[in-house]
């Protein structure tokens, strides 16, 4: 192909007229002689480069006005175009003048002679400083947004209307095991197990056809799939947006694995507490029954024996039968007493498994069970726990049973109170003990009630059985501690108990 021949048009005044017009728009013009490297530029070009009108134009002067980091790049571009042809389009920053740091864009084309030899590089200078500032602001904003995405604990994934991943946050990388570069461009169904993986494209297609809004903005629990093939429960919320007339969907994903493990642990803990509570209640009731019934049963047996002696001299032909019946009745009365004692002994045989436990951990776990719904009841919870009085020697389940009982009693006592505050503290006590205090702002109780609070079957509640506090005190005393209660001067009640302090070793 023959080289393009471009020559300067004849000077009929129209070229100068055009030059003046574009100069009026802040566009500088310039012309570089590729043989002599002589440079000619307009007044606007001088202004853009920060060069005075009295300074002679030169190629070296032009290069000296560029930032050092840009100078070599611009010079290489000019050399490349002059030798190989093509277009010239570079941006650079002005240095060493009042315009220092200002961005200029240079665009030019080659002018060839009739033989096709490049003679001149002629073009324009454009002020693009404002454009660069906008670009910089956009980059800063993008960096800022990416930094935010890096710190968001929940995974964020953006897909287009065809299910193709467009954005994959750092949290998503950690959660699913795919890097951002690997995930972008793939179908989002790689993050799903079957059958959702095969069906997801049809889900999107149906939504785009029907615009059914039930999937947008509503969180739900689904199953996710990691790169290694393992699955996990996750909470998914989806939002929709439009960009360029095309729909995009943003998914916010939270891993529920730890949450479900915690829930399972709480359910297990609750089951343990329920089991121990039932055994404790049985033991307390068996002890009370043994104490209350043994005397009348013994009296029945004695009366039976006395009645038999009265019949000893009787001539009634049925006397032997009556004596036999009285003997059997006396035996059954004694047997009933033995059954109650055996039941009490059986329940009481459960040995405590005392270990070194963290009191703060016991209180936290017991609070998750005993204080469920407290916030909904507008109860202020304040745990003021001393780390220096944290380790105790205790049976975890039994002490949590005591705490749960106290917490639930406190919530019930504050149900009708205007001010609802529950405070739990722990402090070192004498004789290597640690004292735990549970204080509420409920209805409290009269001083004459206090001596009976811990008696079996005594209750101040309409529906109470009266065994909870009795069991709690028995547990604490079995640990070598003691338990007592006081009325608060400002209303409410405070329960205290002590436990043996433990050593880390």
Swiss-Prot record:
Residues 288-503 form the Histidine kinase domain. GO terms for biological process: nitrogen fixation; phosphorelay signal transduction system; regulation of DNA-templated transcription. GO terms for cellular component: plasma membrane. Residues 88-140, 209-268 form the PAC domain. Keywords: ATP-binding, Heme, Iron, Kinase, Metal-binding, Nitrogen fixation, Nucleotide-binding, Phosphoprotein, Repeat, Transferase, Two-component regulatory system. Its cofactor is heme. Heme binds at residue 200. Pfam families: HATPase_c (PF02518), HisKA (PF00512), PAS (PF00989). Residues 14-85, 141-208 form the PAS domain. This is Sensor protein FixL. The gene is fixL.
